[in-house]
Design a protein with these regions (language model features):
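Helix-to-loop junction immediately C-terminal to a conserved catalytic motif
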Residues: 71
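Conserved ABC ATPase signature
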Residues: 132, 157-161, 165
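The feature captures the beta-strand-to-loop junction immediately N-terminal to the Walker
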Residues: 56-58
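ABC ATPase nucleotide-binding domains
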Residues: 257-283
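Conserved structural motif at the start of ABC-family nucleotide-binding domains
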Residues: 25, 39-42
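Catalytic Walker B motif of ABC-type/P-loop ATPase nucleotide-binding domains
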Residues: 182-186, 191
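Conserved ABC transporter NBD signature motif
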Residues: 79-87, 96
Length: 283
């Protein structure tokens, strides 16, 4: 399967770029473990510049663990993660933070924090001991709040926000960091469908308007099909398929990766694949 960026969905279509995109993140022979339990085993994958990549797979297959490793939040037992061609663990922490933003699953913040306080934390990698806060920092925070539609809620406590607004605040913090490479671990968790679409529309706009490279872990196959250029499918700690939504979301692969019998139809809006579950395979 190819990882070449295509846009079967006219809603996702961006201006064509004739240059060959470079690989921003890659994993080679990546093995990840917690204590003696191996979660990811010998994984290879590439994240291409200027694309939205969704990682899918059944529960416990290692999606979030792989994302943590790509974001330099855990060291591999073996193998290597490369950021722009360099071993990510040999790149200084501050330099990584100026290039790569990570939003973990279910992030938490101290009580009493306002939206603006949270977003300002995204500027920490840009600060030095001799220059704690500057006009550039203020501008970056304001721009991030405006981009996520939260400027009017800047002084509101986080606990007063709806689930969708709170998730936007966390994304705003990552935006304020000023990176062009974003890793989002299940950014739609615990949100109703309207807020899921709202958050993913925001992510798509960040990709379109800012040219950002985005990697997301998602559970909803049809949302992954709608918003992704590339889908990486995992099972039992390995990548079993990688390609465009149409290449990956086939009845055979859904059976092999998810033990799911499904009909794959054409999405009437995007023209891409639409997964209609039938039942568990073999039952």
């Amino acid at each position: 399967m190819t990882t070449e960026q295509t846009h079967p969905n006219p809603l996702l279509a961006a201006p064509a770029d004739t240059e060959t995109p470079r690989t921003r993140l890659s994993a080679r022979g990546l093995t990840l473990a917690y204590d003696e339990r191996t979660i990811v085993d010998g994984l290879d994958t590439d994240i291409v510049e200027g694309t939205v990549t969704c990682v899918i797979g059944p529960n416990g297959c290692g999606k979030s663990t792989m994302l943590r490793a790509l974001g330099r939040l855990m060291r591999p037992r073996s193998g290597v993660v490369e950021l722009d061609g360099r071993d990510i663990h040999r790149v200084p922490t501050r330099e990584v933070a100026q290039v790569l933003g990570v939003l973990p699953q279910q992030p938490t913040a101290p009580d009493g924090l306002t939206v603006a306080d949270l977003v300002a934390r995204g500027r920490h990698p840009s600060q030095r001991w001799y220059r704690q806060w500057s006009g550039d920092d203020h501008q970056a925070v304001s721009a991030a709040l405006e981009r996520t539609g939260l400027l009017e809620l800047a002084d509101s406590p986080l606990e007063e926000l709806s689930g969708g607004q709170r998730q936007r605040a966390w994304i705003s913090m990552v935006l304020a960091q000023g990176t062009d490479l974003l890793l989002l671990d299940e950014p739609t968790t615990f949100l109703d469908l309207v807020h899921q679409v709202d958050v993913l529309d925001l992510v798509r706009d960040l990709h379109w308007q800012g040219g950002r490279t985005i990697v997301m872990v998602l559970h909803d196959l049809n949302l992954a099909a709608r918003y992704a250029d590339t889908i990486i499918t995992m099972r039992e700690g390995r990548v079993v398929a990688s390609g465009t939504p149409a290449e990956v979301l086939t009845p055979q692969l859904l059976r092999e990766a998810f033990d799911l019998e499904a009909v794959v139809a054409e999405d009437p809006v995007s023209g891409g694949p639409l997964v209609v579950p039938v039942g568990r395979a073999g039952h």
